Regions:
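Short N-terminal alpha-helical targeting/association segments
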Residues: 4, 8, 27-29
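Cysteine-centered motifs
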Residues: 45-47
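Intrinsically disordered, low-complexity segments enriched in serine/proline and basic residues
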Residues: 18-22, 26, 33
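Short hydrophobic alpha-helical segments enriched in small aliphatic residues
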Residues: 25-27, 36, 50
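Exposed, low-complexity/repetitive linear segments and helix-based recognition motifs
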Residues: 13, 23-24, 96, 289
């Protein structure tokens, strides 16, 4: 096997001693008698072990919502999340940490953590990512629980020269009409509780659409987003150059669904649609997500029945899964509950 393994700094040749000979020469004498393949295997195993330890450290199995639900009262946990708020003195810090499920206050004390880690936590800005270990204790404060920090690490620090811009004052200005600021920082605005709440509600809406149709044995059917012609009228088409030809962004899944209907009979989709409409109102959108269905052998009454049934199912799902989120946005649950019963 010439040219595959190296001995010292040169390519191994057939005239070299057997692989069981000392690899680095007699002057080392440390690994004499070891096979090169064994050494390589050992190094690979060490690398995999180190990688496994890192991946295990980065994996997450403790969620703030479970802590707030009392599942870990009196237990030591390892919490992974992002700093949402931080205040305190030179001896104690009250750090609110968030994850995708909620917020919890973490109490960090200098005499427990030591100067190095305490000062690192103290100087960490909003949205720094942290791993905090400590004891979960029930309290009389807002969320009912807090974490007494005993150790941890700052995984990623925010650059002090570029702090997180979405502050409470910035949000107040945005509510007053400065929406361009939030649009310019959309990737960061997603981290705010308001946007997180809306995304969770959206996820439940999509899940309800899927569950409604699948429970009725509808087949989910996807269609291309590049099309050759109009579905809803040529004046709202987005034209796209397509390798020397003209193509358009789809306005609807309808034409493809009609072609597939004789094969599948009952089909649905959730997909984006694109229409070149000027944004005169919130109902004029250049891009939106579209839930559509197609049925063979159906009367007009049956189609309307599915329309009502879908709305009812979505409303019921939101009331069951996202009541807290809807209330936090100021939505009237009694109004939504009216649509959970049909006919309406």
């Amino acid at each position: 096997s010439t040219g595959l393994l190296t001995r010292g700094s040169r390519v191994r040749t057939p005239s070299d001693p057997p692989l069981s000979s000392p690899i680095f020469g007699d002057e080392f004498g440390l690994i004499s008698g070891f096979n090169t393949n064994y050494l390589m295997l050992t190094l690979i195993c060490q690398c995999l072990h180190a990688q496994s330890r890192w991946l295990t450290q980065m994996s997450k199995d403790i969620w703030i919502s479970d802590i707030l639900a009392g599942k870990y009262d009196g237990s030591e946990v390892e919490l992974k999340g992002w700093i949402y708020r931080s205040r305190g003195s030179n001896k104690i810090r009250f750090i609110v940490v968030r994850d995708s499920t909620g917020n919890i206050q973490c109490v960090a004390k200098r005499d427990v953590l030591g100067d190095v880690f305490f000062d690192e936590l103290k100087s960490s800005l909003i949205e720094s990512s942290v791993i905090l270990k400590g004891l979960v204790q029930p309290t009389d404060r807002e969320h009912g629980h807090e974490l007494q920090v005993s150790s941890g690490e700052v995984v990623g620090s925010v650059n002090p020269e570029r702090p997180f811009p979405i502050t409470e004052s910035a949000m107040a200005e945005a509510d007053g009409g400065e929406t361009e600021f939030l649009l310019d920082n959309r990737h960061l605005y997603l981290r705010t509780s308001r946007m997180t709440t809306m995304l969770k509600i959206r996820s439940s809406v999509f899940g309800a659409v899927h569950s409604y149709f699948r429970d009725l044995d509808f087949i989910e059917y996807q269609a291309p987003n590049f099309v050759a012609g109009a579905v809803e009228g040529g004046s709202t088409l987005f034209e796209v150059p397509y390798f020397g030809r003209k193509a358009y962004l789809t306005q609807s899944w309808q034409l493809y669904a009609e072609a597939a209907m004789p094969a599948l009979e009952r089909l649905y989709t959730i997909a984006p649609s694109f229409r070149a409409e000027k944004s005169r109102t919130r109902r004029h959108l250049t891009e939106f997500w579209h839930a559509e269905m197609e049925i063979a052998w159906a009367s007009n009454n049956e189609v309307m029945k599915h329309g009502e049934g879908l709305v009812r199912h979505i409303a019921g799902t939101l009331l069951e899964e996202r009541s807290d989120e809807l209330s936090s946005l100021g939505r009237d649950l009694n109004l939504i509950s009216q649509y959970a019963d049909t006919p309406y």
